Amino acid sequence: IITRLFILGALIALLPAGVAAQQLDARQRNAETVVADGLAQLPAATPAVFNEVMGELAATGSAGVEMIAGMLTPADKGKNATLEYALNGITAYATAPGNEALCADVRKGLVRAIERCADNANRAFLFSQLQLCSAAEDAAWILPYLDDSYLADYAIRALISTPGTEPVLLAEARKEGLAAERKRALAYAFAEKRMTQAEPLLLGWLGGADARTAEQIYN
């Protein structure tokens, strides 16, 4: 009970003054209470408890995901195991067959959490979760993170693993004045996604390309 109350207090502290989630679940709990109850039961004792808790947490949507992500502390303090367990479980639950209706809101929560997070290691963890559930509509949002030295690799992996990102990748590749690093990232994405339609663009980059860029293009 003490743990639950501590978590609930921390969640309330994260909310703007006077703001509370209004939607109630079947047990008449708001999102803050659902999250506090769920976190207090983790790690789950059985698969049945895991599925029940993750189902309830996933049903809180973007609000719940943002609350849990907002409790992450700088990764070097090593106090994030339960929170990461919860976020990973929510993502897994929302992407499981039959739970697709939950995925969009979970994805939205991860996007907002990444935008608000200031710790690189935590941003990377959140991005790794987004990579598991991102949709084509997220491609334009993900693309600028190719310029983030810490998250660039996570961003390109997300663009590769997400179905339907091909138009955004091609549009980016057609821009003038792309840096060599951006060309290498795009060439890698084209290869991983087997995008033969990008071959004319890649061949056009070979003229004047540095050795690393040329090697990536040929790969």
PLM regions with names:
Residues 1-3:
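N-terminal secretory signal peptides that target proteins for export/translocation
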Residues 5-16:
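Bacterial N-terminal signal peptides
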Residues 17-21:
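Sec/Tat signal peptide C-region and signal peptidase I cleavage site
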Residues 24-41, 62-74, 96-115, 124, ...:
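Amphipathic alpha-helical scaffolding segments comprising HEAT/armadillo-like alpha-solenoid repeats
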Residues 25, 56-59, 85-93, 126-132, ...:
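Core register positions within helices of long alpha-helical scaffolds
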Residues 37-93, 121, 158, 215, ...:
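Alpha-helical, heptad-rich or low-complexity scaffold/stalk segments
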Residues 45-50, 64, 78-85, 118-125, ...:
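Positions within the helices of HEAT/ARM-like alpha-solenoid repeats
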Residues 77-94, 153-185, 211-219:
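Long amphipathic alpha-helical scaffold regions
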